[in-house]
């Protein structure tokens, strides 16, 4: 495995711009992909967790843009694991203080976070020939269970679509047991989501709107300010050597 692993370690103070320049990419063999920056900040309109390869006339379609990740430590702070940029130069980068390592294992991205005696690893995997993405969190070390909150943020749009154009109609959330579907009108397939883990649940908060600024698009003179919609947030608990 060591021969197929590339590591980037982050000792001491970090250069914020470095987190925003370095990018990762995972593909599914259909033309679909997931991509982003090491910080989790979407700097390009093409960054997202699921850009699906759909039949014509849709083609590549942005289906799952962003995941806002909060880690709550027992009796301690709540740390945001991903960065966000809502307006020009308004970058939230708490993750820069807790990301200890980023590596590629067999070409797949792995983030290693360390905070207050807790070590957590995150992986992104796309099954071959499926428009599916798995985001996995594993508690490597820590004496007590930790709570993780995961807020999906979406904007269904064509791959080359403008980020500022709102959806033609409101999103609809359908819940069937522990499965969740977001429907964005007749032009798109539903986005199906599921959280597996201890005490996994979804808390609805009536649809939160998140501003997002795409800095690379702004530099290139393209449409660069948009919004993402979220139905609520998933939550679950992680114990040592367990996954969500």
Describe the predicted segments one by one.
Residues 1-244:
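Terminal accessory carbohydrate-recognition/targeting modules of carbohydrate-active enzymes
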């Amino acid at each position: 495995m060591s021969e197929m692993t590339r590591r980037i370690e982050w000792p001491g103070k970090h250069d914020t711009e470095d987190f925003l320049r370095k990018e990762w990419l995972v593909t599914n063999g259909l033309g679909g992909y997931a991509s982003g920056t090491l910080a989790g900040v979407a700097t390009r309109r093409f960054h997202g967790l699921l850009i699906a390869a759909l039949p014509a006339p849709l083609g590549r379609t942005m289906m799952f843009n962003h995941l806002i990740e909060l880690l709550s430590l027992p009796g301690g702070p709540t740390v945001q694991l991903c960065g966000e940029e809502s307006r020009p130069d308004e970058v939230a980068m708490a993750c820069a203080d807790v990301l200890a390592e980023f590596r590629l294992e067999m070409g797949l991205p792995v983030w290693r976070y360390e905070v207050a005696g807790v070590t957590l690893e995150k992986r992104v995997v796309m099954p071959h020939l499926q428009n599916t993405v798995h985001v996995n969190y594993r508690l490597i070390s820590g004496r007590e269970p930790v709570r993780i909150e995961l807020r999906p943020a979406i904007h269904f749009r064509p791959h080359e679509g403008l980020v500022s154009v709102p959806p033609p109609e409101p999103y609809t959330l359908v819940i069937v047991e522990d499965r969740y579907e977001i429907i964005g009108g007749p032009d798109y397939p539903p986005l199906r989501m599921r959280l597996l883990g201890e005490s996994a649940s979804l808390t609805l908060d009536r649809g939160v709107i998140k501003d997002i600024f795409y800095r690379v698009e702004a530099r290139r003179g393209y449409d660069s300010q948009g919004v993402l919609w979220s139905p609520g947030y998933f939550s679950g608990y992680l114990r040592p050597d367990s996954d969500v």
